[in-house]
């Protein structure tokens, strides 16, 4: 087993829906990783939400045993990676643990924006790349055209591309032969001292934290005392093994292998991804380079609809955090919504998935406030702040300048939808950086404010291109911007949960839209309700919900006018008292609808 020349570590990279997980299923089936009765679609996507949405969120690993045509038995370690931009960090971790990649491209759709990002990441990691063209059995498949597109855009040789249909299993043996013959084995171990890369970790209710590692030098065996170099914490290894994708316990993991171990670690936070693991008695001299830390870019408030559920929400977030170290949260309170948490996410899909997991796995009913990003505030007294909650924004008089984050977005779109996509980017304050054509598809690169993206950009991009546009982005720079805090007042009371930070040019439009929406959502009361949008002390939009009026004269048939006047005066005095002391109850349904992402 310690013949490293018979090991191949590879990851599968592709855009969403191009067939990564299906190809992984076929490879597992072909190599007998699971018996036929144990196979299911997307066998590596363990969460229900992954299967339903057809996306991969957590990278998974499998060891396959393959008897090649040259008569040798090879051990193939497959890392299935996510395709969505929010989980690019998961991709970078998987790539760092491998020497080669299978680049899967849908032969009916060609190169998409995320394909490019993942390929460039693989090239940065010095990966050997095997090109696989999938969905060959579909009538719309155009392999030759897609090959030309790949050569033009990415610049890799397509003459030895493997043509397959992962769904029907055509060409799977060719993929396995290409892995064995074209991808390099791990580098020879230069030392007997343990040096391993911590690729991922997750929480298992029975075993504690399970750690996925790639052994670079030496070996990892049961009962060894190991040290994490970033935290200097020492643990005793309890179990060592690998996935096929079922868990298999083994005695030892040799150099070049990818596997897991458990060591009675209580929290995932104690295991920093990208850390170097070494032997406590004979530590290695130098740590591995590791990864860039993953910082949240989108923030929003999560509140339980019923305040008695707060403790349940707190426990649920702590459990999710055990498996997802990139997700952050802290407690906050709102006068309108009560006590909840301010949470940080990698992007909107990440936000949606955490929300959905909370409602499904923990049966929670939540209100989500409008998403926001991190702003840099420069105060007149020289202090610099970073805020992501509109409620924390200081008084505008004390602020010297504000900076907002901008992103660099790559959009691939068929040319017939180009006009609609360009006008959407312009509407979102975008600046065009580049524009090129590949066959009948346009590739545009835009600089866009992240603040505009987190609302409804992705949905609107998909609808204006009938679902054909693909979009990928990375953080670019912070730039000064004319930002203001848009406040919403109901009967002169500020509703903090509806406050947002917007660009001054969009404030009036967004304020008016929110007022109109709230007017439809808040039920009529016995008095007039004023809904106002404000910037500081200036009101920029107003809507009024007219009062319900009880007919107090309904029982007066004729009779003296003074009797009627007395009843009307009594009603008037009652309404005046209500205006003075009455609190307007905004129903939860109104909050939820008003906070729906995007402007209708």
Swiss-Prot record:
Top-level taxonomic group: Bacteria
Q: List GO BP terms, alphabetically.
A: positive regulation of translation
Reactions accelerated catalytically: GTP + H2O = GDP + phosphate + H(+)
The places in or outside the cell where this protein is found are: Cell inner membrane
Q: What class of enzyme is it?
A: hydrolase
Give its E.C. classification number: 3.6.5.n1
Tell me what topology the record assigns in the membrane. Answer: Peripheral membrane protein
Annotated Gene Ontology cellular component terms: plasma membrane
Q: Name one GO molecular function term.
A: ribosome binding
Write out the residues that bind GTP: 17-22, 134-137
Write the record's keywords in alphabetical order, separated by commas.
Cell inner membrane, Cell membrane, GTP-binding, Hydrolase, Membrane, Nucleotide-binding, Protein biosynthesis
| Alphabetized HAMAP family for the sequence | LepA
Family, according to the entry, reads as follows: Belongs to the TRAFAC class translation factor GTPase superfamily. Classic translation factor GTPase family. LepA subfamily.
Q: What does this protein do?
A: Required for accurate and efficient protein synthesis under certain stress conditions. May act as a fidelity factor of the translation reaction, by catalyzing a one-codon backward translocation of tRNAs on improperly translocated ribosomes. Back-translocation proceeds from a post-translocation (POST) complex to a pre-translocation (PRE) complex, thus giving elongation factor G a second chance to translocate the tRNAs correctly. Binds to ribosomes in a GTP-dependent manner.
NCBIfam families given in the database record: lepA, small_GTP
Put simply, this protein is called: Elongation factor 4
The gene for this chain is lepA
